């Protein structure tokens, strides 16, 4: 399992002085990027093969939010592949050595020329090795959005600071956007994120919030009501 050590920075905190949900997502993303770079299959190499990995789904279970200044270890390990999909585990350990965060993710390998999924080959996955999936609840990568009962929020336009090197809204930014529509007293213990399409600079995002029996669902939609991203929050 690949890992790197870090320390929770002030710039990564939520208002409660703990590592924010989008800060957690950013650490997980950074961890898989660092592993790929160290194995010699980083972004430039994969792009040179006219391929790219895109994130489809997160399942993130939060036992404890790390504190300001806490030394943490972020770890990741591939846990399988099938057709055009790759599967990956993540863990964030606190100073006590216990797992504060556990996560499972699903990725799709794309052909960068055709911008269509392509089959995962040995050169795409073998370097990582394969571990067993974490013992998390097995859930669908598709998040169902209710047909009614949603509360529309004020629409906004995608800005440059929302974007990453792929020129679309970064995965962590969607989580940050969606979290803004939760009640201040709500504590996220699990979040699931389904990425459906790419929002670009200048696109309009229309958030719709739904109250659920165990939390909330936020659909970040385009002007026609099609979701870019759906985030399910459970307390």
Please provide the spans of the model-predicted regions:
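Hot-dog-fold acyl-thioester-processing enzymes
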Residues: 1-55, 102-104, 111-186
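HotDog/MaoC-like acyl-thioester-processing domains
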Residues: 2-4, 57-62, 67-143, 199-201, ...
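Small beta-barrel nucleic-acid-binding modules, principally OB-folds
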Residues: 50-65, 187-189, 193-198
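Acidic/His-leaning functional-site neighborhoods
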Residues: 150-232
């Amino acid at each position: 399992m690949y890992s790197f050590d870090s320390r929770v920075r002030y710039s990564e905190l939520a208002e409660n002085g703990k590592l924010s949900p989008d800060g957690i997502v950013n650490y997980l993303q950074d961890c898989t990027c660092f592993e790929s770079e160290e194995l010699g299959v980083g972004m430039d190499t994969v792009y040179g093969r006219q391929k790219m990995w895109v994130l489809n789904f997160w399942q993130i279970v939060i036992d404890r939010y790390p504190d300001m200044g806490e030394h943490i270890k972020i770890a990741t390990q591939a846990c399988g592949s099938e057709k055009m999909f790759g599967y990956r585990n993540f863990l964030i350990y606190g100073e006590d050595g216990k797992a504060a965060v556990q996560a499972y993710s699903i990725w799709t390998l794309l052909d960068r020329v055709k911008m269509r999924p392509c089959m995962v080959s040995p050169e795409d996955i073998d370097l990582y090795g394969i571990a067993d999936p974490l013992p998390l609840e097995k859930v669908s990568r598709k998040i169902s959005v209710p047909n009614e009962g949603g509360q529309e929020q004020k629409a906004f336009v995608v800005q440059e600071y929302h974007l990453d090197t792929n020129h679309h809204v970064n995965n962590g930014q969607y989580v940050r956007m969606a979290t803004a529509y939760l009640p201040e007293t709500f504590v996220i213990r699990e979040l699931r994120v389904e990425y459906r399409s790419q929002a670009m600079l200048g696109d309009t995002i229309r958030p719709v919030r739904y109250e659920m029996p165990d939390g909330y669902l936020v659909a970040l939609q385009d002007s026609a009501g099609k979701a870019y991203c759906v985030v399910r929050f459970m307390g």
